């Protein structure tokens, strides 16, 4: 029986054996069906290759002779062509006979001398017939018949005889003989007796064979016989339908159908007739290299080891001497291009998951080119889906065989992955697509180019790769646990965790794909209920906020949207994916709906609803051409169009214009729409905002097929919660008359609701009713009576208002009808623009040509204003220059007429030394005594330097006359306001500038040299004058002349080199000068975005004018027609800049294997004392704000600026105007992305001053650890804040700081200390306060009023508090404290104490004192903390006496060390702090927790509860 179509039969399934009885079965009904035709099996191919390896001409010819039954031997030249054909015609019986015969000649094909899988020949199934392959070209004849050989006796030289029955072939050639037989000499008869006679005749003939060959090649029966219908069938297959050469499956099926139709006509049974599949390799072996590869694959399959090596292969087949030659031949032929044929070969083995090809790749992989491995993997990628042991073995073999292939597959560059995916080549897409974890682990490597996390997780969610997600999350958690167990801080980075992503961000990507399976896994690991921010725009997931319908609230809401949009645009320009929680957008992909999404979306949305997470309707801008409604988009057939990894939209962060709700309506899926409406309405959303921009939707859903969706949209099953019911849910229908009419028909009750007119106007403009600002104001006067009112009752229903806004002719009538309304207030153009800007100016996707032109005109107006100011300055300079020339000409005339009568003018010039003129150059020399010279006409150029006359002998300088007629004192013109530095400093020898003389006589000491000068000067005068002038020019003048813009008291330049910050809405920060002398940062803000900004700035200026040096000062403000300018303190950077620079330097040093000693933060901090002062700068700044009733609400390292090597606080808030630099002042809702906001901010609860305390605690940790965060890495930071799980291990060496910070960052805001209490913490105690605390503690211990109880004494000796009487706790002192302190010191402290009290030391006892003979003796209980405190206090108080006693005592080994620590009280305290480091903090914590108000009196201001 032939193999089934499309599958390859294993070798043992092809070994058919017929006995004599079976030969006669099924002979009725048109002939015998026992004529079994064999296909090209592995057995025959193995034999073929072994025959070739023998290189024995006689054997090869015998094989051909056996196959054809020809009397003559073929020529050797025909062997290469005929070998493939003869094996196709060789039955398995003949294969066995040939092996037995050759074994008798001591020629072996196998090492074990047997072909084991041929020994057990299964019984054949003779119900089907398969056509034989075509005969060789040389033997094709016009007639061919097939008959059956019954029994043949095989005889060998060893006496081996066997009776084997099988079918062979007989070919008839009309040109040579009538009939030629293949393996028999007679035809089969219908009875067994005839068959036996024929067998006997065959045996007799075989005995006469010269070669002792078991077959007689001569056909002694020459008689012709009639051709049966079965033979006619075979003849058609062989000559008319050569299926062996047909590779097209369609053509093959057509031919098969034609054959069956012919057989029906001839009344031949066709139920059991089938045509065997086309052989993989053409029967004629024209491609020798492919034949070798196929043979090697089969030979490799005979070995058991899957990871087969070439050495093992050669050793196994070592008897075949020529095998190495064929291996080398195979290696040389690999350079030929036969990839198509290789793919055909691979398409046979790989779909069957045959281990032969795995063994072949492992064995010969080093010889195979990467293109061949790519061909194998191409078939693997197309045919294999789910992983198993075979697929893993195949991938391991392919990756290990060729480095180039491995590099291509394991490279995670998105462009390369896209390219391979487009070509259907194997890549990491295969394990992701079919969720194969083991395969993913093999391919993914952190050492290679890492995947962009957003792109990777997008693919994971798209294909619902659950197993891979579970593996990555578990692996990440395991790594973190391992880091914690090893005592390290878990610090993820791209090299360690390249696929790490914030859980909230991953949930957003899930929402983009409606991947409920991945979202369910996330919910198992993370609790999003408490960690979800208020406006988390996933696609977007968010919690609703209360929005009232007042004018102020609406304006604020729209302004927030504008800021959000501007921020997205800025991120888009910088190609940076925003990581902010409110406005995070990952992949702005097209919103598509297909059959897969149809199943996914309702489940995902219901999962979000059950988890109390509500969906925002914003998604990416969609396109109908990308919508595929076929489920096959997730199968292999559709490959490239949908994925689009390399699409530019992957990083596009533009604002959405098509909402999720609109796409669901267009998709018209009932289940998805119901789930979405349920989620939105439970979250407090209303449709008026969700669909306000959807003008195209209004047209789309008016069609009849959307009737059901509209009914669902307006049914009563999804009511709005009460606090949102004031907003009309149908405002978005304002622009569509058809939908309004439909609304009136199905839901008339909605007309009685109150209408928010501002929402309605926004909807009208968004729907395109007014496409430009001009058109809006053109119609405004007609409708202002309506548009100026906040709300309208049922009196003016929706349809009437629609009529008014759409039909101008009815406006006057309706206005007269409703004039009894209360008189409205008038909105000015600015307020109307706020509404207009929301729907036009800031929405690029719906902006019209008019609005774009208006924006362009605004920019041109600004440029023209700049040009106008520039021209004005030039004109002024030109006019001033003209006036100067006139004055100079007048001076020249006067000087010429009075030359002969001129007397020297005594001028006192100080000797230009470096002490007197700090700005002079080192090359300057003292001015020599002037010599009278001839006069030279000069052009006076103003120099802003005054030379002071200092000698009393010099006569008083007369006042400058009004007219330049006297030659005694030249007039100094006023410096032009806009004169440049070049005009002030350049002097030429021809026109030296005159000296400017101060008219006020001053007599300094010591007197400088006096220099007499006349109008006539020498040639040295210009040089001297120039030198003196240059040395006196202040640096400030140089700075002033760099700034070309003057606004009030501000001077600055808009050149890029002077820009130190940029923000949204065109906000810029420049470096400039205020009042011509003070450097400031000048912030330029648009008036249009906040008309009340000037008032807010005035408040901030008033606030910061108060005496506080720890906050940024708001110096002054100026404004022009377009901008407001705010002057701020100019700083040198921020704490974040300082830390980030260190991180960059460390990274570079690590990569270059260098030691980095240039730690900027460490150098900036310096000593511990300076660190305390820097921290106090921050605390004092926050304390000042809190005293003024201000909550900063956005403290982070970026807002801690550096000025004069001290910290000051910035970003005090300025009307949502955000700047991305150190000059950032915002009061918008904090993002929380960096982890500097407490849980109540993230959950949008009431914000108090404790918010700043939490942020300050995080900043202190950040400062003291060089940039680390108290809640760990960003991946878990949000979750740790919400679950109150700080990670303070990096600061565990400083327990006092840990205690303070842990209080400041407590989740419970009531547990956080105030700024006053922070400054009282032991962390800020100096030496005096520590001594004061010890004294107070000792006084408490001595209290006689019962304040110090035994219970309190027990508490201060235990680490933990115990509630029960019998419970025990770990003692604070691990051993007696005398073992911690030097014995010599203990002894002398005790002696000194008893000397002072008049007693002596008698050692330890259960009591603290003992009275003997009227004397009181003191001693210490070394297990008691209070005695340790008493010892410390006594040592501090009497350190000099104890030092003296020790110095007089016999010397000891550590005597000098003890003496050194007794030099001062501070050293004594340091000594005990080193021996018992946690004592003061321990007592502070115990007293603060357990002391009542009476006991706290001892501590005054040291402890405040």
From Swiss-Prot:
Chain ranges of the KEN domain: 1327-1505
Reaction it catalyzes: L-seryl-[protein] + ATP = O-phospho-L-seryl-[protein] + ADP + H(+); L-threonyl-[protein] + ATP = O-phospho-L-threonyl-[protein] + ADP + H(+)
Positions with a binding annotation for ATP: 1060-1068, 1083
Matching PROSITE patterns: KEN, PROTEIN_KINASE_DOM
Ranges of compositional bias, category Polar residues: 159-172, 978-989
Active-site residues, Swiss-Prot/TrEMBL: 1194 (proton acceptor)
Ranges of Basic and acidic residues composition bias in the record: 562-571, 862-882
Protein name: Probable serine/threonine-protein kinase irlD
Native source organism of the sequence: Dictyostelium discoideum
